[in-house]
């Protein structure tokens, strides 16, 4: 026998079946065997460019996404490698699981990071530090106006204002002049023509580099030799000095002042710290005004916890990636104070290539727990797996410490009652006090 593999669902790819059959990992085989037909259809979907999975808590969406990655790697194994996949996730569930699966299937681990970390790295030349999302949320709890500012700065209206500002910079940011190199001269009028006509499609702050390269090419042709680096760089800098500034922090501050918003403190790079509410507006301006290195090596992007991404973040992702995507999450599990239905605005961002799939049936929790949670957040379309348990006990208390001690005594009358328990409090300060 070459390989043995049992499955309740049909998987067409012979190599994937062979690899699973050769592998003795019980965890992988058990999950594959129990995948339902509708989940298998999601895993093997290769037609839709943008696949959005709205899955209730405990519906198996993460498991489906994991197996979808494995299936795609083997379905398109000639063109898609693990290095061509990027996972944007705030937690390590993907990397922890995939680190066991992919080596067994002959693949290296896939790159995974949070989108916040990705953004912070992109802004290292703009600010020395960026505020964490959790700090932003805690500030919103203390200050309702902070929540209003954050919502505003992630909105389409704010993006439209930044777009208008970017168009105005086309003229306001520029101070054109002649540029000379030895006996060669590029006149102001020639530079303006190149800048606004020939290279109009290049982002504003990268456009002058193209003008400079044109002049350098002309010089090298006439001299019949390449200019050495020590001569090229000062020449390019002459062109870049025609910008009033190329500092995105300064430009964003200029935008805030123009539109009547509270401005950021004027500080040198090494002392700048961006509030979380400003991180993605600055990043958007950076991608709007300058040419960034293309991530052409990424052929499939996986976005986890889709409900925690703002409209602005998705607009940035669209600018950064032109590849296929698997986007998954649950609008009921957002970290925001109020639910935002990303499924309402995603089609407007990604267009007709987007297909939406809903996984409503929850398998993880008992009917009592799932029903309580659904009522708490106003979810009405959840389908429950008929597994019953103890009812949820809800109590109002005035002494949190005493209530916690009582709960511990109730949950843990002996060491064998539960393996784990969680105490959820509204902020870090309360958690530290209880610990």
Language model features with spans:
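Conserved helicase motor core of SF1/SF2 NTP-dependent helicases
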Residues: 78-79, 83, 92-108, 113-120, ...
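Pre-Walker A (Motif I) flank of P-loop NTPase domains
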Residues: 47-51
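Walker A (P-loop) phosphate-binding loop of P-loop NTPases
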Residues: 58
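N-terminal accessory nucleic-acid engagement/regulatory domains that precede
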Residues: 1-18
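Pre-Walker A adenine-sensing motif
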Residues: 33-45
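Conserved lysine of the Walker
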Residues: 61-62
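Hydrophobic anchor at the beta1->P-loop junction of P-loop NTPases
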Residues: 53-55
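Alpha-helical nucleic-acid-binding subdomain
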Residues: 73-301, 307-316, 332
């Amino acid at each position: 026998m070459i390989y043995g593999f049992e499955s309740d669902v049909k998987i067409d790819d012979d190599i994937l079946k062979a690899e699973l059959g050769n592998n003795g990992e019980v965890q992988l085989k058990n999950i594959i065997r129990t995948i339902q037909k509708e989940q298998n259809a999601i895993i093997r979907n290769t037609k839709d460019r943008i696949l959005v999975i709205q899955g209730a808590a405990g519906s198996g969406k993460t498991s489906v996404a994991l197996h979808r990655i494995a299936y795609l790697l083997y379905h398109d194994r000639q063109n898609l490698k693990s290095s061509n996949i990027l996972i944007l996730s705030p937690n390590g569930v993907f990397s922890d699981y995939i680190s066991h699966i992919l080596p067994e299937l002959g693949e290296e681990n896939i790159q995974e990071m949070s989108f916040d970390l990705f953004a912070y790295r992109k802004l290292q030349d703009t600010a020395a530090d960026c505020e964490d999302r959790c700090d932003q949320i805690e500030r919103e709890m203390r200050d309702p106006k902070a929540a209003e500012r954050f919502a505003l700065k992630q909105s389409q209206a704010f993006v439209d204002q930044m777009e208008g500002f970017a168009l105005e910079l086309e003229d306001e940011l520029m101070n054109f002049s002649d540029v000379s190199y030895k006996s060669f001269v590029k006149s102001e009028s020639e530079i303006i023509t190149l800048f606004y006509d020939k290279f109009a499609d290049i982002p504003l702050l990268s456009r002058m580099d193209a003008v400079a390269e044109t002049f350098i090419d002309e010089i090298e042709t006439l001299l019949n030799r390449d200019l050495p680096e020590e001569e090229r760089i000062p020449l390019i800098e002459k062109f870049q000095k025609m910008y009033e500034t190329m500092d995105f922090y300064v430009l964003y501050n200029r935008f805030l002042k123009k539109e009547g918003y509270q401005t950021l403190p004027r500080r040198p790079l090494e002392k700048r710290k961006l509030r979380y509410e400003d991180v993605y507006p600055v990043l958007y301006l950076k991608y709007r005004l300058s040419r960034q290195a293309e991530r052409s090596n990424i052929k499939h992007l996986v976005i986890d916890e889709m409900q925690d991404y703002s409209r602005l973040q998705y607009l940035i992702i669209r600018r950064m990636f032109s590849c296929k995507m698997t986007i998954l999450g649950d609008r009921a599990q957002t970290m925001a104070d109020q639910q935002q239905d990303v499924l309402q605005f995603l089609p407007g961002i990604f267009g007709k290539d987007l297909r939406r799939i809903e996984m409503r049936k929850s398998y993880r929790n008992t009917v009592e727990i799932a029903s309580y949670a659904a009522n708490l957040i106003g979810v009405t379309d959840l389908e429950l797996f008929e597994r019953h348990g103890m009812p949820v006990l809800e109590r109002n208390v005035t002494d949190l410490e005493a209530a916690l001690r009582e709960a511990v005594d109730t949950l843990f009358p002996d060491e064998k009652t539960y393996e784990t328990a969680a105490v959820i409090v509204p902020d870090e300060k309360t958690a530290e006090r209880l610990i």
